[in-house]
């Protein structure tokens, strides 16, 4: 038995002590986690800057603040979330009462990505703790400074058999995903998600897969172009485009395309200044592998660049870039970009835009900028996507009352707020039947009972 396997079985043993099923225990662990995050705030911010070049305002808002808010909500609502529910019982089961009990799955695995390497560890972990599970966390090896801070924070806060962090790369992940966890929560690419899903299926382990895809933005002829440009630039270029729900491409009505490009270019200068590379508010690509993947896409689209296009390998810097005259068969349209390059395509009618999106895998997010209520309702009703926004980008993630998750190739399962608790909770059903009464209608011998059985099922 290797070290990882031993940690897994130690975690299973801790769960079997029944400690985590105590509601007061769970609330106390969430309280400890909140306190630890606050005490590690400066270390977390420094690590996020070192690994991804994140400005501390952006880092706090998207990584720390949102996590602390989730903990606060979970602690406040946990008593209600965990209540056993008494549900209606049909007359033919009289005298019986029916219940749904919320119970933890057991020992869960959380695999996190590099783009929001702190928040995407702790958001699912909050749900796992609130639901009463033990957990093993695998942070991304591509953000090693954040991973080290997470490990220190967890080790100083929790019993290692309760919450454990496994650092490492592909080898460690392969070992973990083949173990018989009670639940696996994965955030990352579609290709790796398929590997995780296949491995989990060997042990019939339920999974949540939070992946990505090419999330479109539709800008119609009625849109407020200034507002659209600001909100699209925020959604696309936050974290240097390394956001799973970032706008991947724009579908703009041909009549307002030039105005939109002008507005986007102006907004980028307003956000980051004339020398964007020197801006303290603009991030960096996580590593050279992803940098070279993105510069390869840029090189294939040199004739399409209408803004940006510059890069610096030493800094892993890629300038925010706008591409015009892009077609569906362009290289940039064949994969999720996951970087600061924004292709702009045109359409003539909403039917054409909807058909274009229908022809592609279901996106994790979709955004529409429009003042036309009919167009808005058509997009909402006719297109399938994980989540999205009308006249904004990204911000649907900020509401903990909304479930977040993909559909089709962009993922399965959902979380955030109570949905995180539900994800890591098994709803166990049972009935309680009195021993004082028994109709006997359902028991052999059945002679003469047919009409009574039919009568029961009519009620």
UniProtKB/Swiss-Prot annotation:
Reactions mediated catalytically: 4,4'-diaponeurosporenal + NAD(+) + H2O = 4,4'-diaponeurosporenoate + NADH + 2 H(+)
Cellular component per GO, a single term: cytoplasm
Knockout or disruption consequences: Cells lacking this gene are unable to produce staphyloxanthin and cause accumulation of 4,4'- diaponeurosporen-4-al.
UniProt GO BP: aldehyde metabolic process; carotenoid biosynthetic process
GO molecular function: aldehyde dehydrogenase (NAD+) activity; oxidoreductase activity, acting on the aldehyde or oxo group of donors, NAD or NADP as acceptor
Enzyme class: oxidoreductase
Residues of the active site: 210 (proton acceptor), 244 (nucleophile)
Keywords tagged on the record: Carotenoid biosynthesis, NAD, Oxidoreductase, Virulence
PROSITE patterns attached to this UniProt entry: ALDEHYDE_DEHYDR_CYS (PS00070), ALDEHYDE_DEHYDR_GLU (PS00687)
Function: Involved in the biosynthesis of the yellow-orange carotenoid staphyloxanthin, which plays a role in the virulence via its protective function against oxidative stress. Catalyzes the oxidation of 4,4'-diaponeurosporen-4-al to yield 4,4'-diaponeurosporenoic acid.
Protein name stated in the entry: 4,4'-diaponeurosporen-aldehyde dehydrogenase
Gene assigned in the entry: aldH1
